[in-house]
Curated annotation (Swiss-Prot):
GO terms for cellular component: cell cortex; cytoplasm; plasma membrane. The keyword Cell cycle applies. The modification Phosphoserine is found at residues 171, 253, 336, 343, 352, 399, 423, 490, 497, 521. The gene is Melk. Autophosphorylated: autophosphorylation of the T-loop at Thr-167 and Ser-171 is required for activation. Its EC number is 2.7.11.1, 2.7.10.2. This is Maternal embryonic leucine zipper kinase. It comes from Mus musculus (Mouse).
Length: 643
């Protein structure tokens, strides 16, 4: 596929780690720096009328730079695709962390909530409203710090932040009353309500307003009455009351939230919402490395970087900066490499870009070790990258003054967003304090990635020449990433979901349709490619036994010691729950459908051997669909198994 040619010059694609209505997210490795990234891939034709929202998200992320907001690195647009290269957050969703704990303690909630406040206050200070705040849109990085994602529904009102918005959007369970009534509203006030729902979920483990019936849920939200669990402290109850006010004019403001007594408890200062990482000053080490690599002067390189075009040069600079911040040398790779353990396979020419279109998961290459990209190199040297230097020399005479951001050409904005010049934001005086750490295990965890048991070369025609004489190295199946130590999910209360997308023109009932195995054509296409590439036994297949993993917050422990028995138990219960599935070794790729045949949920269940004797577990990962429906469904499946 020609749409992928340019992308594959700079990145090696691996497995799909998330899907949505019109997009999928793949794990990838940036070739020059060896850093892991997440690439959001969107089809323009499928987006249709939602294309302006993608432009809005890109514009927002280009102008937002904050320690608790997922960083945009690179935007690539072709005739049919839009690629957004984003910061990879291996820690997983806040939602998964909450349900693994049942609920968080008030102290831990405060640490998490202050980070959410910091991100949202900064977003508001830049004139934006997020409008889709929920646990699924908050990810943990490798340091267990939160990052806000998904700005597809954000709005930058015409005029100023006091301009009233009209669009009803977001998720019903988190939406403010004035928004679902169809009234005009202030984005900042609606976000405060959503943060109130978030705060409740953090401390309680379930939604304050929840019902299977949409109209019943609507009435509950409008009444503003919710259960107050006995374990909530008086100060937390008061804060929830102030945030979950049905009348937005009586709702607490963001300014007062930042120094609220509950938020300030155990802290000596209000929440520090200003950006700690502004792009007003370029890092000398990173600029020098890029200058040497592209054989250009420092001044030329500084001018090119400072134009912030969010092309490959911007991505390389920001990834070098991230690498340096993690204590790694700000150096670019000079050798041909692939991110993973060594594996000799047939030449990569056997896998063409045309093969890429046969499956969503055709780039699956196994469980990724976050550090392997920069450590595992092959001997043969690759030709120097000269294309960008040529472009840079041509652009040097035209490049804007340092610090000026280029506006996106042909912007498509909705009625609530306006094209405004972007400028660097000066930091105000920052509060200095040391945040207490969230109680996690000694080893920081990394996000579990759905893995394919077969390793195969990356389908990159653009890089075929420099890899022609070298064996291809792709990610192998690791034993799993360092993880949090938590137990079995046993929620205080079973949560139903009414996390309804308010942008949908129709509502659907709970999935009831029974079907046969799905993903057939996709899987068959992928299997043909894999069979052509390797004749040996697939590692990770049923004959090899389950993969070994460390205990993670999305792994449920069992009392069974026989993995085959557990796998049989799960496969027997899935049809009873109206779940279609495809088996690949000890991994079950599952999905549910509506009565109209629409896929409503996709997730994986993998039987794994935990890294201690005679203990078998189940790894769970949601790929698509409502988080609370997923939670309830997986609980029903696991409770039906004899574990």
């Amino acid at each position: 596929m020609k749409d992928y040619d340019e992308l594959l010059k700079y990145y090696e694609l691996y497995e799909t780690i998330g899907t949505g209505g019109f997009a999928k997210v793949k794990l990838a490795c940036h070739v020059l720096t060896g850093e892991m990234v997440a690439i959001k891939i969107m089809d323009k034709n499928a987006l249709g009328s939602d294309l302006p929202r993608v432009k809005t998200e890109i514009d927002a992320l280009k102008s937002l730079r904050h320690q608790h907001i997922c960083q945009l690195y690179h935007v690539l647009e072709t005739k049919n695709k839009i690629f957004m290269v984003l910061e990879y957050c291996p820690g997983g969703e806040l939602f998964d962390y909450i349900i693994s704990q049942d609920r968080l303690s008030e102290e831990e909630t405060r640490v998490v909530f202050r980070q959410i406040l910091s991100a949202v206050a900064y977003v508001h200070s830049q004139g934006y409203a997020h409008r889709d705040l929920k646990p699924e849109n908050l990810l943990f990085d490798e340091n267990h710090k939160l990052k806000l994602i998904d700005f597809g529904l954000c709005a930058k009102p015409k005029g100023n932040k006091d301009y009233h918005l009209q669009t009803c959007c977001g998720s019903l369970a988190y939406a403010a009353p004035e928004l679902i009534q169809g009234k005009s509203y202030l984005g900042s006030e609606a976000d405060v309500w959503s943060m109130g729902i978030l705060l409740y979920v953090l401390m309680c483990g379930f939604l304050p307003f929840d019902d299977d019936n949409v109209m019943a849920l609507y009435k509950k939200i409008m009444r503003g009455k919710y259960e107050v669990p006995k374990w909530l402290s008086p100060s937390s109850i008061l804060l929830l009351q102030q945030m979950l006010q049905v009348d937005p004019k009586k709702r607490i403001s963001m300014r007062n939230l930042l120094n609220h007594p509950w938020v300030m408890q155990d802290y000596s200062c209000p929440v520090e919402w200003q950006s700690k990482t502004p792009l007003t000053h370029l890092d000398e080490d990173c600029v020098t490395e890029l200058s040497v690599h592209h054989r250009s002067s420092r001044q030329t390189m500084e001018d090119l970087i400072s134009s912030w075009q969010y092309d490959h040069l911007t991505a390389t600079y920001l990834l070098l900066l991230a690498k340096k911040a993690r204590g790694k040398p700000a150096r670019l790779q000079l050798l041909s490499f692939s991110c993973g353990t060594a594996s000799t396979t047939p030449k990569s020419k056997n896998l063409s870009l045309e093969d890429m279109s046969t499956s969503d998961d055709n780039c699956v290459a196994g469980l990724i070790d976050y550090e392997l990209c920069e450590d595992k190199l092959l001997a043969p040297k690759t030709p120097q990258v000269t294309k960008h230097l040529a472009e840079s020399n041509h652009a040097a005479s035209k490049s804007p003054a340092p610090g000026v951001r280029r506006a996106v050409a042909n912007k498509l904005m909705d009625k609530e967003n306006v094209c405004t010049p972007k400028s660097s934001v000066k930091n105000e005086e920052q509060f200095v304090f040391s945040e207490p750490k969230i109680p996690v295990s000694k080893n920081q965890y990394k996000r579990e990635i759905p893995a394919s048991p077969t390793r195969f070369p990356t389908p990159a025609k653009a890089r075929a020449q420099c890899l022609r004489e070298a064996p291809v190295r792709t990610p192998g199946n690791s034993a799993g990433a360092d993880t949090l130590t938590t137990g079995v999910i046993s929620p205080e209360r079973r949560c139903r979901s009414m996390d309804v997308d308010l942008n949908q023109a129709h509502m659907e009932d709970t999935p009831k349709k029974k079907g046969t195995n799905v993903f057939g054509s996709l899987e068959r296409g992928l299997d043909k490619v894999l069979t052509a590439l390797t004749r040996n036994k697939k590692k990770g297949s049923a004959r090899d036994g389950p993969r070994k993993r460390k205990l993670h917050y999305n792994v449920t422990t069992t009392r069974l010691v026989n993995p085959d028995q557990l796998l049989s138990e799960i496969m027997a219960i899935l049809p009873k729950k109206n779940v279609d599935f495809v088996q690949k070794g000890y991994t079950l790729k599952c999905q549910t459908q509506s009565d109209f045949g629409k896929v409503t949920m996709q997730f994986e269940l993998e039987v794994c051997q935990l890294q201690r004797p005679d203990v078998v577990g189940i790894r769970r990962q949601r790929l698509k669909g409502d988080a609370w429906v997923y939670k309830r469904l997986v609980e029903d499946i696991l409770s039906g198994c004899k574990m």
